[in-house]
Structure formats: structure tokens, C-alpha cells
Amino acid sequence: MEAHLIFGPTSTGKTSVAIALAKRTGFPVIVLDRIQCYSQLSVGGGRPSAAEFQGTRRIYLIEGSLDEGVISAERAHECLVAAVEAHKPEGGVILEGGSISLFKRMAQSSYWNCGFTWHVTRLHLGGEEIFLAAAKKRINQMMQPDEQGNSFLGELVSVWKTTALRATLEGICGYRYAIEFAGKQGLEMDALTSLNRRQLEQLVHGMAHEYLCYARQQEQELPLPSLAGGEGPPFQ
């Protein structure tokens, strides 16, 4: 089975690379991301829009509710294996993402060591200025309503209303900074949807730097890919 693995830090273009490859091969993209499993956080979690799919197939490990808690790395790995097995008759899959915990679980599993011909694309964190510019562009887009009317701040305000989910939001990059920003500014959470221009610029700036910190963590902690590629283990 052909297995195309595309991974690396946040905001390095993994999704666009995966979509382009899916258009060329016809293989489905299986998303190696635990937060994208939840449509309640589709914008902040980084789910591309239907238009961005460009007719390709994008498969999430589950379609869950945050009320059940964020899926564990162990459970996510079980779902990933099941998704790959389900698509074996197609001859290939594209695995795309950057979840540190899920990739570490993959690296521990012998499942991936045989039966696959690997094509590995490891995207890397570039210069700080380039990353921050790309991150700010992405975040500014997230602040605008998408075709379904969803925006990053709208998602945050909506989910925050459920007290039991607040700890979950506080543990997710981006949402965490926005929550801290509201506290430091003395704002009620609802007020985040009506920030003035200066406040919005401050929020975007801070979120971009939080993304940079997370990207550096991913750069350091994601498993090293196999140098050979082809058959055998995908990681060193």
C-alpha cells in the first residue's frame, strides 16, 4: 500500500501540500490531528473549508463532540489504523498532520513497519519572520466568518458558554492565548467578538507568537523520519 506521510509544525503548509497530492493521486487525506476531530472548533482547529478541499477527500479520525473530551493519542491511533485499513482497497492514503502525541504513538507501533511503501515529506519551521507573517495571515483569515458563518472568536465565545468545556479550550493553542488576552484586557468573553482594530491587532500578534512557540515544540519533538523511505519503518 502506498502511504504518503506529510508532517511538520503548524502553519508550514501541510494541508495545501496534502490537497495538491490528493488531487494528483486520488488518494484520501487522513488527518493526524486530534483537535480537528471536533466541528465545534473547525476554524481554530485548522479545518480547511469545503472550497479548499477542491474535490478531494479529507477524513477525520472521529467526528466527535467536545462534551466527551478531546480524544486521547491512544484512541486516535486506533482510529487511524482503522481508517487506513478501511481504505487499503484504494491502494494508497495520504497521512497529514502534526500532532506530537499521535506521531509519538505511531513511532511506537509496529503496525507501520511493514505492508507500506512510504513517501515521507517532512516540512520544517523556517525563519521566524516568515513564520510570523504566515501565521498572522492565517489568524486574520480565521477572524473573518467562513462560508458557514463561523469564525475563531465566534467559536470561542460559543464553546465558552459551556463551563465544563472551558478547561479544554484553555489547553488548546490559540484559544488559550485569546482567553488570557480577554482576562488581561478585563473583557468579558462575549466582548471578544467586538474588539476594536488595535485590540484585534494585539490579539493576532500574540496568537502568532503562541503558534511560533508551539511550532518550535513540534520541530523538536516530532519523530525523525526514516532517511531511506520506501518499505520499512517510517521513523528512525
Swiss-Prot record:
SUPFAM superfamilies: P-loop containing nucleoside triphosphate hydrolases
Catalysed reactions, semicolon-separated: dimethylallyl diphosphate + AMP = N(6)-(dimethylallyl)adenosine 5'-phosphate + diphosphate
InterPro entries: P-loop_NTPase, Tzs
EC nos: 2.5.1.27
Enzyme class, spelled out: transferase
GO biological process: cytokinin biosynthetic process
Domain of life: Bacteria
Key words, A-Z: Crown gall tumor, Cytokinin biosynthesis, Plasmid, Transferase
Role played: Transfers dimethylallyl groups to AMP as part of the biosynthesis of cytokinin phytohormones.
Similarity comment: family membership: Belongs to the isopentenyl transferase family.
Protein name from the UniProt record: Adenylate dimethylallyltransferase
Organism: Allorhizobium ampelinum (strain ATCC BAA-846 / DSM 112012 / S4)
Lineage of producing organism: Bacteria, Pseudomonadati, Pseudomonadota, Alphaproteobacteria, Hyphomicrobiales
